[in-house]
A protein has these predicted regions:
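Extracytoplasmic/periplasmic substrate-recognition and gating elements
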Residues: 73, 150-151, 155, 192-256
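Short helices/loops that flank or line small-molecule/ion binding pockets
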Residues: 15, 69-70, 88-95, 166-178, ...
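Hinge/lid segment of periplasmic solute-binding proteins
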Residues: 6-60, 198, 267-270
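Glycine-centered hinge/linker elements that transmit conformational signals in sensory
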Residues: 89-91, 130-162
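Conserved N-terminal structural module of periplasmic/extracytoplasmic solute-binding proteins
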Residues: 1-16, 26-31, 164, 177, ...
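Short helix-initiation/N-cap motifs at beta->coil->alpha
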Residues: 7, 81-87, 159-172
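Long, aromatic- and glycine/proline-rich binding clefts that accommodate carbohydrate-like moieties
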Residues: 251-299, 303, 310
Length: 337
């Protein structure tokens, strides 16, 4: 058994190194597949219908805001339904305190990819033959981020540094009253002071509903294991993903439970009364998107990484950066199709 992200688990499955878990599920009359959040469960299937992985827990990027900054600027977090609402809030925060960043997206492509998905954008055409990362939905979102950071100066990013240095600098700004909020991982909750910050879901874009990615961390069953070992692995998968264990995991780590009924566990219900932020990732994941597989082995994501730096750090136009990324990504896709 191993705990892996989706790309690595799928790669092992493509090499026939992990077993199909479906026969174990089919033979288990007590198994309740419908209680698993669909966005996490469905990431375990390949295109041939093989169930190559079980979701162990999930992660999704949510919004953390500085309670005092919002209050001082007269902002009600419940009123932020769109990225345009967040833009207006960031402007108010900057007007109230010119030394404070209105909002800090996390450096890199993923926050902007989430916003694109919430704008109705896609990575591929429906037939999977064309990369669509320079469509109007993409350009609109990425150009807005460029404008907010470089022209309006209502947002900022931390970039570079050693390892996760940029991530913790972003968090520190919000905790030190230097930023109105930031976009970060559900797993950040263990590092945050919720007397100073609160959590909310990512908003939609314009008239489009919120649809950020929700990623599963997966448990796989190794193909060469004995029948007895495989049965034991299946039992552990069920045990780890029981509502009670999912509740404990979520409360202690901030990561997202993969079972809907986790919300009915008494300890979790009591916990979320005092820690409402723990419910935000679970609620967001219920309408989250599955990040599509990059069939090029990562070259499409690499092209977007370069484009994100050009937009966020260098201030290049989104159209220019995404047109270049589109060309690179399409060539990579054509080479494997």
């Amino acid at each position: 058994m191993a705990l892996l992200d989706v790309d690595k688990a799928r790669n092992l499955s493509n090499k026939d190194l992990v077993a199909d878990i479906q026969p174990y599920v089919d033979a288990d009359s007590d198994f309740d597949k419908d209680d698993y959040l669909q966005v996490f469960w469905n990431q375990g299937y390949d295109t041939n219908g093989k169930l190559f992985a079980f979701p162990a827990y999930g992660t999704t990027q949510i919004m953390y805001y500085n309670i005092k900054a919002f209050k001082d600027a007269g902002i009600n977090a419940d009123d932020i339904r769109t990225w345009q609402d967040l833009e207006a809030a960031a402007k108010k925060i900057r007007e109230k305190n010119p030394d404070m960043a209105g909002w800090e997206p996390m450096w890199g492509k993923w926050n902007m990819v989430d916003a694109v998905l919430s704008n109705g954008g896609k990575v591929f055409s429906d037939d999977g033959k064309t990369v669509t990362i320079n469509s109007k939905e993409w350009v609109e979102v990425w150009e807005s981020f460029r404008k907010w950071i470089h022209d309006d100066k209502i947002m900022k990013i931390h970039s570079g540094g050693q390892g996760w240095e940029y991530w913790y600098k972003t968090i520190d700004d919000v905790l030190a009253d230097k930023a109105g909020g930031y976009t970060g991982s559900s797993g950040d909750q263990a590092d945050l002071d919720f007397t100073k910050v609160a959590a909310m879901e990512q908003p939609g874009w314009g008239s489009n509903a919120s649809a950020p990615t929700a990623d599963a961390l997966q448990l796989v069953m190794l193909q060469n294991s004995s029948d007895e070992e495989k049965q034991g692995v299946y039992e552990f998968m069920k045990y780890f993903t029981s509502p009670e264990n999912q509740a404990n995991w979520s409360m202690n780590t901030g990561y997202v439970a993969v079972r809907n009924s986790t919300q009915k566990v008494d300890s979790f219900k009591e916990y979320t009364k005092d820690h409402p932020q723990a419910l935000v990732p679970l609620q967001q994941a219920s309408h989250g998107s599955i990040l599509p597989e990059d069939p090029t082995g990562g070259k499409i994501w690499d092209a977007l990484t370069v484009a994100a730096d050009e937009v966020e750090i260098e201030g290049k136009s989104a159209q220019e950066a995404l047109d270049k990324a589109q060309k690179t990504a399409q060539e990579a896709l054509d080479a494997v199709k």
